[in-house]
């Protein structure tokens, strides 16, 4: 794959060149303004094009290194497209009110996310033992938490880059990112302050069609990063546009693993779940998309070693996938292929 391509004509047709009324401008945007028409500032798209390419490259590079990108757009015309774009590129989003401390107080936010998971589990089980009123209250709590945290509940930690629509509205998010040294790529209109933005993309941040174009390009850049990152590991990316529950591989410096034909029967110990690891457990975070939380989930289910995953038959995959609610990740992310490669590498060492 490669970075998504776009043209100045696409930006023009989407209305990306229309700024705000000239009396509502921020003087710091003067270098990006082409002129004025009918008392409306016109943005210089000759600067927008290379700036947007730079932002796309930053997104792709961040994801290729195993980083997370957080889409931030809480205004009405951006909310839906921000969520859709983040989901299809396996990234994260905030499209409702930004909660203070989302980045700078991640520990507290994580507690709220755990509460959301607990409520989800209770309601998924039918709310047994609860009264009708208690179930209703839990359902309302879930809706409230899902609206605020649904886009980041699987993020697993602070993001590595923010993509922001409307820097005026999302000032709090930008301040938190700046405090933590997290780079920010943002669509900056003529009434905005470009200071503190790592990748300034001068463009209209109000037109729905323009916002859809920006988000689509950023999503495709993230997908390109996933392809590059997994390609560097010698992996088949499979359905790379599916969201992942944990972070992407954090270490791209692992030696490239050989491909294994999983259609061949596995020669080794048969698959079984263990009450405890046999010796030291294997580092399951080397598997694509597996982070500490998912390792704990696998351990709780009785999976500690590569050989267990390598020995899985289709019926084992289906059972474990269903019990742990992995949404097809064992097959999609190639865990069996990777586990067999690690087992063979250990045997050859």
UniProtKB/Swiss-Prot annotation:
SUPFAM superfamilies from the UniProt entry: Ribosomal protein S2
GO cellular component: cytosolic small ribosomal subunit
Gene Ontology molecular functions: structural constituent of ribosome
Pfam families from the UniProt entry: Ribosomal_S2
Top-level taxon: Bacteria
Keyword entries, A-Z: Ribonucleoprotein, Ribosomal protein
BP terms from Gene Ontology: translation
Family affiliation: Belongs to the universal ribosomal protein uS2 family.
Name under which the protein is recorded: Small ribosomal subunit protein uS2
Species assigned in the record: Methylobacterium sp. (strain 4-46)
